[in-house]
Amino acid sequence: MWQGNLELIYTQKNLATQISHLYATAPLKVQRPFYPEGKNLCHTVILHTAGGIVGGDVLQQKIHLQAATNALITTASAGKVYQSNGQMAQQLIEIKIDDNAGLEWLPQETIIFNGAAFRQHLRVDLGENSSWLGWEITRFGRSARGEKFLAGEWHSNWEIWRSGQPLWLDRSFLLGGKMIEGFSGLNDSALIGTLVYIGQPVDRNLIEKVRDFSLEGEMGVTSTLGDGLLCRYRGNSSGEVRQWFQQVWQILRREMSDREAIIPRVWLSW
């Protein structure tokens, strides 16, 4: 069992976003930062060196973007949560984004194996004029092998706050078996995705652009409190939801910051 910790602090120095503090214990690790979009947007890749999460693991991450910094954080590969040994695996993430800073939190998908027990909690605290774009893509069962999530449990809690006020609170819970098959659960789908943007005002034209995609899976798009956008997906194709979320990200980049998104090179192996 692992008790992994990661601490990251981003600081602006000479108009560049730099990692000023990094502390990591196994199995968590951070690759050398990249700057494919210029010195004030730091691309950061987090690795899980053990290959997957097991029952009893507790992984904690604390990430702080100081004022006027910008970062994109992703993961080196898909996350895996293995069948439980009877204990709950936990992932706890706290993110603080100071005034005029921005974070794009774009991890690769997480695969929840049949029989896994997993709880994750993500809290984001935003400063004034700061922005957040984050997504979560979760596959239940190794469906490529015909495996379904027939036993186990999954909990996912998201919280996004600004100045002590909640902007987005999302509590999700799924038991293996009937909840996978039922319409109020996954409706016999294998995969769900959530994308949340909080930042500048989102108008109707932008929402229509985001909706203007033809998907085999089910999709939903709406605005949120705090000048935000919410996208939901339920279906079976990792490639489809990744492509849609990437296109939404690119639209938001163009509309909100007048620049094109550059795909992290670690994604090129997808």
Predicted regions and their residues:
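N-terminal, charged/glycine-rich beta-strand/loop interface patches
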Residues: 1-109, 114
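N-terminal intrinsically disordered, cationic/polar leader segments
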Residues: 1-5, 9-25, 41, 90, ...
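A short, polar/proline- and glycine-enriched secondary-structure boundary/capping micro-motif
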Residues: 29-32, 82-88, 115-117, 143-147, ...
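Short, hydrophobic/aromatic beta-strand segments
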Residues: 73, 132-135
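Short, surface-exposed recognition loops or helix-turn segments adjacent to catalytic cores
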Residues: 108-110, 135-140
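A structural signal for small-residue-enriched, beta-sheet-centric alpha/beta enzyme cores
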Residues: 138-270
